[in-house]
Structures are given as C-alpha cells and as structure tokens.
C-alpha cells in the first residue's frame, strides 16, 4: 500500500515538472507565463519561442502522462489504480506545485494519459483534433473537440462506467482550463497557429 501511495505522489511531482517554463527559460531566457497567451503550454512555447522548443515541450508533456500510467500496472494492474495515477499526473500538470499551482491546460499530458489507458478513443480524439485544427487553425478548438469526443467514444466502444466517468471528469477539467480560449473563439479574437509561417 505504501508503495502505491508513494508512486502516486511521485507521479504528481513528475506531472508538476513545468516543461514549458523550463524549455522557454533554456531557449529564450523568458518566463513563458509573461509572453503570448500567458499559458505554460506547448502551443505558447511553439508560438513565442520556436518550433523546436514547442515540439520538445509537447513531447515532454505527453510523456509526463504516458510513462507513469503505463508503468503503474507493474505495481497494481487494477484499472482503478491506473486511473488514480492518471489523475495524479493530470492534477500535477494543471496545478503544478513548482509554479504556485498554476500550470498548463492538460491537453498534451491528457493525451499521454489516455494513450496509456485506452488507445482507440485516444486515436479517434487525435484524428478529430487534426481535422478541427487543419480546417480552423485553432489549437484550442481542436483540443476542445478532441477532449469532448473521449467520453463519447469510450462509452460507445463499450468501456466501463468507471472509464467513462473518468474521461468525463478530465474533459470538464480541460474545458474549464480553456474557458478564456472559448471566450476568444466566440469573440473571434483567438490566435491561430500557422505551423509553416516564418516568424
């Protein structure tokens, strides 16, 4: 039991590692929270620091979610324990102890978490994100559409009630973290991301 609890605590601390903040400081010598959208996330790093820095941040955030959940099964192979570990990773990223509990929006880490928990709903969500982004160039819109699909696909693909409830809770958290983006989308003032546009 002690090992299980320690693993969850370690997962929270790993999830709390502020990838965007660290990468931005290392590359642009700036506090990512003070530039662009002010969000400590991969998209803001991509836009304000550079493509390479953004990709590094994205990969780091995904791994923060995937690795702890994947290896949780070696400690306890019950799905409920994996969900607890996944929740710790998400909470760590969104409410990081290293930045006064003000972290990212949870999309990339959520992607890692869900790929470790359930592959098909994650692949469908990734495809939905891609389509929404390609047609709109809004990362926030793609993220919102993708995360909304998760509880729906997990339900229709026959996953347990426990899974559906967990994905629904994470969906609500991510949508809440995107509340300012939603406001800007409605006002048509949200920034688009053009990957191949030169700075």
Swiss-Prot record:
Keywords: Cell inner membrane, Cell membrane, Lipid biosynthesis, Lipid metabolism, Membrane, Phospholipid biosynthesis, Phospholipid metabolism, Transferase, Transmembrane, Transmembrane helix. GO terms for molecular function: acyl-phosphate glycerol-3-phosphate acyltransferase activity. It is a multi-pass membrane protein. Its EC number is 2.3.1.275. It holds the Pfam family G3P_acyltransf. Pathway: Lipid metabolism; phospholipid metabolism. It is found in: Cell inner membrane. It catalyses: an acyl phosphate + sn-glycerol 3-phosphate = a 1-acyl-sn-glycero-3-phosphate + phosphate. Disulfide bonds: none annotated. GO terms for cellular component: plasma membrane. GO terms for biological process: phospholipid biosynthetic process. InterPro entries: G3P_acylTferase_PlsY. The chain crosses the membrane at residues 3-23, 55-75, 79-99, 113-133, 155-175. Belongs to the PlsY family. Probably interacts with PlsX. Catalyzes the transfer of an acyl group from acyl-phosphate (acyl-PO(4)) to glycerol-3-phosphate (G3P) to form lysophosphatidic acid (LPA). This enzyme utilizes acyl-phosphate as fatty acyl donor, but not acyl-CoA or acyl-ACP. This is Glycerol-3-phosphate acyltransferase. The gene is plsY.
